[in-house]
Amino acid sequence: VILNYAFGDICKGMNTTNNNFNTTYTNNFIEANALKFKYANQYELNSNLFDNSLSYFNNELSSNQNVFIVVLEPGRVRKIQILEYTNTKVVFRHGNIDNTDTVTVTMTLNPNNNYNYYSFKNKDFVLVEPANNTSWDIEFTKYTTLLTEFNSTKYYGVTGAIFNPGKKFQYTFLENININDVDLAKASSLSLKTDLLGIGYSWKKFSSPTNDGFYAIEPRTYIVKDSSKYYTIQFTEFSKLIGGTTEKGYPQFLQNNL
């Protein structure tokens, strides 16, 4: 179970360790427990909000039915309880922390997708992934991770590339190497690693602590292996000039199929 990591460091929550969904919570309770709030994505070890909510019993997943409080964005808070989790469906309920607007949802799991999506705002399922979860390789998105920038270590919302979790990609990278200087012989001689965030965000470096700062692109080439095929990737841009203003969020890269 993950939250929409595209919200960055806004969307987070806490496990109340309480099974009674009818318990009323207040904004004062949320503020008092702010330090207990965690993120929920699979790309950062400390972003494990829901990790202890499910357990295996007789080779099947079961829920401990703990109630979670989730801040979806400033001023929008919901409580969530997973009632049932099987290989084919998830049953959960959610509502406001004052016990209003409670909804119980049965979500049928699509085996062709890595994830199945639901909107608390619209109270409906959302189609996000392509119909076939093997039809894509990397996703460019925003996610939350712990990092140090300008002598400050904290959780940041970063933008980067994530491998398709439904595939078994391996990767490495070479610093100060042009993409055209890496051939198949060179790529196949390298030791590779497995990590969904193998490409991640570090191919660019923020050059200023202000929001209008520019990004410098690191001079590195990524080597990616999918099954027996090798690819190389080298990023060239993260910004784009639009109407005379430099806007971030437009990654460009070179690719070679070896």
Task: List each model region and its residues.
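Surface-exposed, beta-sheet-biased, low-hydrophobicity segments with strongly acidic/polar composition
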Residues: 1-258
